[in-house]
UniProtKB/Swiss-Prot annotation:
This is Alanine--tRNA ligase. Catalyzes the attachment of alanine to tRNA(Ala) in a two-step reaction: alanine is first activated by ATP to form Ala-AMP and then transferred to the acceptor end of tRNA(Ala). Also edits incorrectly charged Ser-tRNA(Ala) and Gly-tRNA(Ala) via its editing domain. The keyword tRNA processing does not apply. The gene is alaS. Binds 1 zinc ion per subunit. It comes from Mycobacterium bovis (strain ATCC BAA-935 / AF2122/97). One of its GO terms (cellular component) is cytosol. It catalyses: tRNA(Ala) + L-alanine + ATP = L-alanyl-tRNA(Ala) + AMP + diphosphate.
Length: 904
């Protein structure tokens, strides 16, 4: 049974049972605690916690999931995958344990003709949480499972959570007996290779707190209602139904392996474990990379971008270790598209962009490997010269960490040169790096806002945002927080409120102040008391959302006192809001213009909007041409001047997308969304920000620059409105000043400047020619006046004229060539206006035969001028910082030559 048929049967089974089919969410969600979506229930968390009312009592989905903590284990075993599909059914207070068990059993054991998977009931085992007697009884009643095929396990195995605070509960896992060839009998507690887990039924009934392990966390209490969250690994059930040994032999991953095998001309699964590991790494990581790029991730140096970069580099590295030097990533992306396209049509529709980004990373990494190879050769040569036979762990780590050079290639190349590698030292340094990374991640996690302080208010209901309709609202203070702790309710005049000079957080029941989100920074404004507390006034410096529902106002209390329960007036600074709306609406204009000029692959990757300024990041390979940049600016301003009406309305998510509304990769949207339309089809986006009422209010948009901020990601910055005018006025004044100084009309300034630059370069070139001619004449004179110390001819001379190290090397070559084949040494030191003193020494082969080495002599120079230097026996150089030591340095060289030449 093909995987697309397995998926269809799953969804059809639950839709027939009354479930609503919900599309997979992006693997990227707006959650600081979650790098990637790693479970099917993630998009339903607000329903489980009771934060939002689900629009359906039951649901089913097949969620894209990514887990990367065990990335180094991928390929070594066949059990680890970085990407997997989690088929699930969910109940939000509807059915519970009995319903979940009945539905799962029916799908697994019903015949193919009846829409099931047709598994043998006698080969199915289950595990349950150790004290869940109800689940044991239900498995016996519903499925007729004997007691010996129902095994009890502890919290680590059968009590499920996402690993972070949130919903949790006991679980029951379903296993399929693959037969004695895979391991001993005795059920899952004996062998999870023979007894393969295919489905996990989680009886979601509690909420957990912070914890460091699967068992070390506090149960905070019951959820508002009992829920069901199940997860069936599509790849797992596929290997059972396709009767293959592991997921890499299924129709999802085997095509990628076959593509690699054709290029490598090496067979897979013929007893070469190391090659098989590489095949599996390529298959797994290629698929994950395609999904990540498809969901809007670009290769980078941190966060999600770093994970993607690491995956692609492991693919390229593994291919090279299989003997593939040619580019292969493009072919891999095409194979993934063909295998996954029936289930994920976006991989087909967006293939050109996905492939372009992946291939660009391959090209960049190949350059890294080339430079790393050169560095390896230097390190290996240095190791051998020292007499060692082992490349240090430190060198291997530097190659890996700084230059991206894979340890496997280091090991292979070291073996080819007769060296070993201190793998233990390397692994220790890698482990230390991982420990630091985990500590940093833990610190970031715990630095995130402690939601428990706000839990009572979150549970009580959301803040009503009134800022789309008014800039001034009457509100009630629901809570006051200082340093993350709630201030007890007190009466006015009693210590415990928020008084003058304090910096506090105020939570209101309603507010017109926009909370930072969607790239738009928070509003500034004021919160003022009313009635008997009208003297109270606070300046709002920031507004943030807690749990996406609660507006937290960070304020400086300027006068009076605030107490929980007070009625206040929250007001937005009108000038601030006007500038913010100009910036945000301008961003939509620039986005639309970029897509019009570059095409639909110019996908938004981030933005920042503040009064008078916008910053827009988008996925694109390579810089914009001058013509493209001009077009973008022109299209943007034409749309602004067209005075388009800006219309906002709410719509169902699916309908909004069908209308052509742009939904940003990685964003999590509710079922009902806010749509912002500017000029009909010109710009249509899902957006929760504040905007102008017509595009003319944006004012002029001036693009300041366009640059790269990472692999495949570009950034446009622009001024809007009055800030744009001021920028243009400043540039106009600058141009007028240049025209006046150059005594030409403004339109002739560029040509005049170009002419001046050309003349300046010609003058500099002529000056350089004269300087070098003078230096060569000096070289000729120096060679003619060479000292003879014993049988060695020596030129030891200071050079004037501000010579550089490169100049000295050139002159040394000239002088040495004029001294003939007898033993000769040249030592030159440059003097000039700067304190830096460059120097160089050369010794010809005849001098080296006498034991004179340039790299030894350069050390004599270095001591006298307080510098450093190095090189080889024939040529060495360095620089110092003490010009007064030049004469002493040259004398030191003469003395050293005299000693070696044995002249008294």
């Amino acid at each position: 049974m093909q995987t697309h048929e397995i998926r269809k049967r799953f969804l059809d089974h639950f839709v027939k049972a009354g479930h609503t089919e919900v599309p997979s969410a992006s693997v990227i969600l707006d959650d600081p605690n979650l790098l990637f979506v790693n479970a099917g229930m993630v998009q339903f968390v607000p329903f489980f916690l009771g934060q939002r009312t689900p629009p359906y009592p039951t649901a089913t989905s097949i969620q894209k999931c990514i887990r990367t903590p065990d990335i180094d284990e991928v390929g070594i075993t066949t059990r680890h995958n970085t990407f997997f599909q989690m088929a699930g059914n969910f109940s939000f207070g509807d059915y519970f344990k009995r319903g979940a068990i009945e539905l799962a059993w029916a799908l697994l054991t019903n015949s193919l003709a009846a829409g099931g998977y047709g598994l043998d009931p006698e080969r199915i085992w289950t595990t349950v949480y150790f004290d869940d007697d109800e689940a044991v009884r239900l498995w016996q009643e519903v499925a007729g499972l004997p007691a010996e095929r129902i095994q009890r396990r502890g919290m680590a195995d059968n009590y499920w959570s996402m690993g972070i605070p949130g919903p949790c509960g006991p679980s029951s896992e379903i296993y399929y007996d693959r037969g004695p060839e895979f391991g001993p009998a005795g059920g899952p507690i004996v062998s999870e290779d023979r007894y393969l887990e295919v489905w996990n039924l989680v009886f979601m009934q509690n909420e957990r707190g912070e914890g460091t392990t699967k068992e070390d966390y506090q149960i905070l209490g019951p959820l508002p209602r009992n829920n069901i969250d199940t997860g069936m690994g599509v790849e797992r059930i596929a290997l059972v139904l396709q009767d293959v040994h592991n997921v890499y032999e299924t129709d999802l991953l085997r095509p990628v392996i076959d593509t690699v095998a054709r290029v490598a001309a090496r067979a897979y699964d013929v007893g070469n474990h190391e090659d098989d590991v590489r095949y599996r790494i390529i298959a797994d990581h290629s698929r994950t990379a395609a999904i990540l790029i498809g969901d809007g991730v670009s290769p980078g140096n941190d966060g999600r971008g770093y994970v993607l970069r690491r995956l692609l580099r492991r693919v390229i590295r593994s291919a090279k270790l299989l003997g593939i030097d040619a580019a292969i990533v493009g072919d891999l992306m095409a194979t993934v598209r063909n295998a996954m396209g029936p289930s994920y049509p976006e991989l087909v529709a967006d293939f050109e962009r996905i492939s372009r980004i992946a291939v660009a990373e391959e090209t960049a990494f190949n350059r890294t490997l080339a430079s790393g190879s050169r560095l390896f050769e230097e390190v290996a040569s240095s190791t051998k010269k020292s007499g060692a036979t082992v490349l240090s762990g430190s060198d291997a780590f530097t190659l890996h960490d700084t230059y991206g050079f894979p340890i496997e290639l280091t090991l292979e190349m070291a073996a080819e040169t007769g060296l070993q590698v201190d793998e233990i030292g390397f692994r220790e340094l890698m482990a230390e790096q991982r420990r630091r990374a985990k500590a940093d991640a833990a610190a970031r996690k715990h630095a995130h806002a402690d939601l428990s302080a706000y839990r009572e208010l979150v549970d009580a209901g959301a803040t009503e945002f009134t800022g789309f309709d008014e800039l001034r609202s009457q509100a009630r203070i629901l809570g006051i927080f200082v340093d993350g702790k709630r201030v007890p309710v007190v009466a006015h005049g009693v210590a415990g409120g928020a008084g003058e000079g304090q910096r506090v957080e105020l939570v209101l029941d309603r507010t017109p102040l926009y909370a930072e989100s969607g790239g738009q920074i928070a509003d500034e404004g004021t919160i003022s008391g009313t009635g008997s507390s009208e003297a109270a006034r606070a300046a709002v410096t920031d507004v943030q959302k807690i749990a996406k529902t609660l507006w937290v106002h960070r304020v400086n209390v300027e006068s009076g006192e605030f107490v929980e329960g007070d009625t206040v007036i929250a007001a937005v600074d009108p000038g601030w809001r006007r500038g913010a709306t100009q910036g945000h609406s301008g961003t939509h204009m620039v986005h639309a213009a970029l897509r019009q000029v570059l095409g639909p692959n110019a996908v938004q990757a981030g933005s920042l909007n503040r009064p008078g300024y916008l910053r827009f990041d988008f996925n694109w390979q390579g810089p914009l041409t001058d013509d493209q940049r001009t077009q973008v600016e022109e299209v943007t301003n034409e749309a602004v001047q067209a005075d388009f009406e800006v219309r906002t309305f709410t719509e169902q998510l699916d309908k909004a997308k069908a209308m052509g509304a742009i939904a940003l990769f990685g964003e999590s949207y509710p079922d009902e969304v806010r749509v912002v339309e500017m000029g009909g089809p010109f710009s249509l986006e899902l957006c929760g920000g504040t905007h102008v009422s017509n595009t003319a209010q944006i004012g002029p948009v001036t693009i300041l620059g366009e640059s790269s901020i990472g692999s495949g990601v570009r950034r446009v910055e622009a001024y809007v409105g009055l800030d744009s005018f001021r920028h243009l006025a400043k540039e106009r004044a600058l141009m007028a000043g240049l025209a006046s100084s150059l005594k030409v009309p403004s339109e002739e300034v560029p040509a005049r400047v170009a002419n001046l630059v050309e003349r300046l370069r010609a003058a500099e070139k002529e000056l350089e020619r004269v300087r070098m001619a003078s230096a060569r004449a000096a070289a000729t004179n120096a060679a003619a006046g060479a000292q003879r110390i014993g049988n060695v001819r020596l030129v030891a001379q200071r050079m004037s004229g501000g010579m550089t190290a490169a100049d000295l090397r050139s002159l040394i070559g000239d002088i040495r060539g004029k001294l003939g084949s007898e033993p000769a040494v040249v030592a030159l030191i440059a003097e000039g206006e700067s304190q830096t003193v460059p120097y160089a020494v050369a010794a010809n082969p005849a001098a080296q035969d006498l034991g004179i080495r340039a790299n030894d002599l350069v050390k004599q120079l270095a001591v006298a001028v307080e510098g450093r230097g190095g090189g080889k026996a024939d040529l060495a150089q360095g620089s110092g910082k003490n010009p007064t030591g030049i004469d002493a340095a040259l004398d030191a060289v003469r003395s050293e030559i005299a000693v070696i030449a044995r002249v008294g």
